[in-house]
Amino acid sequence: MSRVKRGNVARKRRNKILRLAKGFQGSNGSLFRTANQRVMKALCNAYRDRKRRKRDFRRLWIARINAAARMNGMSYSKLIGNLKKADIRINRKMLAQIAILDPTNFQKVVADVKK
């Protein structure tokens, strides 16, 4: 059986992990074993939090819309239900932006929906 030398491949694999771990504190950024563990955990967290970010922003938009709607005498659920009945297609992100940046137009939207 012939001998297999993996020096180049192994070094590249380790250096790839160490490049990903650049900036980590202490041995987590310089020793391969600990860096590998930290990088794996960081990638898992990044994957999880990319999914979580979508949920978090939706919750934030709903909270903002609810606060603005209640200032105009309507609950969030009634506002969204009436928007659907009136066939007004504004998504929650846009509604939250309107509520914060342009309260007068948000009042008009609520007034249109109340009819």
UniProtKB/Swiss-Prot annotation:
GO terms for biological process: ribosomal large subunit assembly; translation. The keyword RNA-binding applies. Belongs to the bacterial ribosomal protein bL20 family. SUPFAM superfamilies: Ribosomal protein L20. It comes from the Bacteria. This is Large ribosomal subunit protein bL20. HAMAP family: Ribosomal_bL20. Transmembrane segments: none annotated. CDD domains: Ribosomal_L20. Gene3D superfamilies: 6.10.160.10, Ribosomal protein L20. Keywords: Ribonucleoprotein, Ribosomal protein, RNA-binding, rRNA-binding. Pfam families: Ribosomal_L20. Binds directly to 23S ribosomal RNA and is necessary for the in vitro assembly process of the 50S ribosomal subunit. It is not involved in the protein synthesizing functions of that subunit. GO terms for cellular component: ribonucleoprotein complex; ribosome. PANTHER family: 39S RIBOSOMAL PROTEIN L20. GO terms for molecular function: rRNA binding; structural constituent of ribosome. The lineage of its organism: Bacteria, Bacillati, Cyanobacteriota, Cyanophyceae, Synechococcales.
